[in-house]
Structures are given as C-alpha cells and as structure tokens.
Amino acid sequence: MPAARYFKWSYDMKKIILMLCLLAVSVTMYGCTSKEIHKDSGLMKITDDNGRQVAFSKKPERIVVLSPSFLELLEVLDGNVVGRAESTIVRTPDFAKNAAVVGFIFNINTEKVVELKPDLIVAYKGMHEKYIQLFEANGIPVVVLNLKTYEDVKHSIKILGELTGQKEKGLKIASELDKKVQNTVKQLPKNTKRVAILHSSAQNVTLEKENSIAGCVAKLLQLHNIVQDIQSVTAPTGEQMSDKAPYNLEFLIEKDPEIIFITSMGDKNDIEVRLQNDVMSSPAWESITAVKNNAVYYLPDELFLLNPGLRYS
C-alpha cells in the first residue's frame, strides 16, 4: 500500500489502534434498541430495521443468513443456520461451515435459498431489500437488520435472541461486553484528537461518517471525526453510501486532522493507484499534521469493512 513510511507508531497511537480494533469487535455485540418485539397468544411480531413488521408462530429452526456478519451472533445464540452467503473478508465460523452456500453477499442465489425451505432469512440493511418480495412470495419471512454502529448491534442481538429463544443469553453477553468497552475507554488518553477516516475503493475515495463501523468506534474512543464539521453531510450515491461523505482534499487541509485512518474495499493494487492519484500525489497532502507526524494508519479489512463478529471477545 502507498505511504508505508507513515506507519510509525507512538505509544499513545499503539494504544489507540489496539483499542480501536478491540472496540470494533466489541461493537458487534453491544448497542441500544428502540425497535419493538410483541408476543400475543404464541404469535411473535418484530419490527425490523426497515420498519417492517414480521410475524412468527414458532421459533425459527432453519435460518439462512444473506451476510456472514450474522453468523457469529447466531452461533452464540444457538441459532440453526442451514444456509449462508459467502464473503472474501469475513471468515466462516466452524459451526456454519456445513451450511449450504447461497452465493456471495452481493449476489445471492435466490433459487438455492428457496430450495433450503428456511423459516427465517436474515438480510443486511441497504443490501438485500431487492430480494424481500421474492422470498415473501414463497412464504419465507425476512428480517432486515443493520450491523454498523454500536446501537445497531445490540438491537440485532436482542432480535436474534428473541427469535432463537435465547433472550437472556443475549442480554448477558451484551452486559459483559458493555463492561469491557467501559474499561477500554477508561484507559485512553484524555485529550481529544481530530481524526479523518478515508475509505478507498478502486472507483473513489470517500470520508467515513460516525455511523460507519470505523466512525462509530472512533467516536467511542472520543476522537473528533472531522467529517461531522460538514454542516450537511450527504452520501455520494445511494442508501449503501449513507455512512460516507464526499472526499475533498481542501476540506482535509482546512480541518488538519491529527490522525488519519484508512479503510479499503477491493483489490489492493487498484486501491493503491486510487489513493495515489486522488490523495497522496498532491503536495498539499504533506502539509497535513497527521502526515507530518507519521500518524496515517491502515485499518484491517476484516474488522472495518464488514461487521467483525466475536473473534477477539
């Protein structure tokens, strides 16, 4: 990757990066929910993250997940997964390796899903809405959940805990991880630093907002994300980009972040070219405090592109 020379780690930055990664994992299991769960005469109704009410007459026994990010949550909640989508980033827990593969996270094999006769499909918000009508036409209930922010994840645990009959277990896990997060934050340096989080793909470079995975964790670490200084933060394109804002070098120079984190998606060579062309080739890049102080850090894809699960908890 470009600018490898910026990987000089001070003691405080080692601590911050370590805390960032640990919290990214803890975030997968904690947050807060205002969504509804109702039980009436054996019928359970939930409201998912798209505001849809979904009814169940019994506990689902055959679950298909359209994102591997849900697998480790379902593992600790003893969910029976019969089908799963794959990703090149998120590893598959051992308990789900024998589950049928239903395509990749961005390209679901709908025929395979229907063949499995699931009684619950867990879909990722902003990614799988196009499949809902087809699955419901086949009598399969679909619950859409988000897994980006601290808040999203606790909600997902509560919903999945209810659906798998493991409500108390889910609440206990969330409580334990809450304590870990609080202990982590207590160890951080007290001074707030300005941070910019760049996200690079082969197509473009954007800034990550507080509702992205990295942005949410940076907020927990009490870092000030400069993108929040934009009066009207809008997404470049579409709902899937709602956690990002357009990249602007002039804005970056004006706000002069003390730390820069970089997340990425795609082929590393293509990303290197994009970062060099759009960001690092400008002489003005060298004037930014984070660059001058060797405080530019690449964050691991497996923790900050998709929800990282429970691997370090």
Which functions belong to the PLM regions below?
Residues 102, 109-126, 140, 248-265:
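Proline-aspartate-enriched helix->loop->beta-strand connector
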Residues 20-28:
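Bacterial N-terminal signal peptides
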Residues 130, 146-159, 193-217, 270:
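Extracytoplasmic ligand-binding site segments that recognize negatively charged/polar headgroups
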Residues 154-155, 162, 171, 182-185, ...:
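Structured C-terminal subdomain patch of bacterial secreted/periplasmic proteins
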Residues 204-271:
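Flexible, glycine-rich surface segments
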Residues 92-95, 127-159, 163:
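Flexible loop/hinge segments that line or gate small-molecule binding clefts
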Residues 2-12, 16, 30-69, 168-198, ...:
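Bacterial Sec-exported substrate-binding components of ABC uptake systems
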Residues 65-116, 120-125, 223-226, 230, ...:
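A short, structured surface patch at a secondary-structure boundary
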